[in-house]
Amino acid sequence: MRIVGINRLIIKLILLFILFPTCNNNEKSYSKIPIIWKEINWNKYDGIKILEGRNNTLPINAWVAIINNNDPTIDIDVIVSDDLDRKETLSQFSTNNKATVVVNGGYFLMNKNPTEHVGLLYVNNQTISPALKSLIRNNKRYFTARGALGFLDNGDVDIAWVTSRNDSLFYFPEPVENSPDNPVNSFDFTKSLLWDVDDAIHAGPVLMHNGEIRITINEEVFFGSSIPKIHPRTAAGYRKNGELVLLVIDGRQVNSRGVDLMELAIIMKDLDCIEAINLDGGGSSAMVVDGKLINRPSGTSSQREVMSAIAISLRN
């Protein structure tokens, strides 16, 4: 009886492997990721362009919103849920904030009710959640200034390594020099500068800096986590002309595997970004345009409730 039971278990495992091949994810990392982009036919607005893209090799499906931040009719904001549990879907964000384009924002604790943001959440010059200043990894405490995405009311975008002190935000021109087993045990604020933004959100790691790929996994203490691996992704960046680039890539699907951080950085560079940052990914990665979900988060048409988002709205 015991042998028969074991044989049945083996048969079930074989069937699962055959029926669900995505469980055996392609872990190869690609250095060239050509994507064929085409503009989506939707209710077009000046200053907002929505493209969908496909790469058949990895394979991946991707969507990108390109925002002209110099357009006076466009507002770019970090928004946060005011529901009792501090979470809502992107479609709800879109409706409640009258936003044309919405993508998910920073990390949050899904097991908390109400949920809590992981790191800085700064909206309309008010701190909703303080900057993450240190964390424990391998029984050691690391002080870190993680990557943050910031917006000014005039439309300017910035990406920097950010922390806070006495209710003020500070950025470091270079990341705090953490590495595995070599923690930095305090901040040297003499190396920092005041970060003057109106909205900001911690996420990370930074993917690009000064026009080059620079993924600060170790410095931001993402080593030893699942963040660098292949996942559905959301990323933000900006071009030399100031245009904001918001990217969403589906993953965990037969026809869209997702990407690792290096692949994500390559795609953002190919989109002409000079600075870029990884945002919350996995089942949270989604883009809503005119109130409609345009991607398939983790292969479904349902939306995960998230705490924060980036919203593109038209001024009345």
Describe the role of every protein-language-model region:
Residues 162, 167-172, 203, 211-213:
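A short "linker-to-beta-strand initiation" element
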Residues 180-187, 195-223:
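Short, conserved active-site entrance elements at the starts or edges of catalytic domains
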Residues 1-31:
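Bacterial Sec-dependent N-terminal signal peptides
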Residues 112-137, 218-275, 284-316:
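Conserved, well-ordered active-site substructure
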Residues 100-104, 150, 158-159, 207, ...:
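Structural recognition of the beta-strand scaffold that forms the well-ordered cores
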Residues 25-167:
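Zymogen propeptides
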Residues 28-52, 215, 292-316:
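Flexible, D/E/H-enriched segments
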Residues 60-64, 146, 202-204, 231-235, ...:
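Short glycine-rich loop/turn motifs
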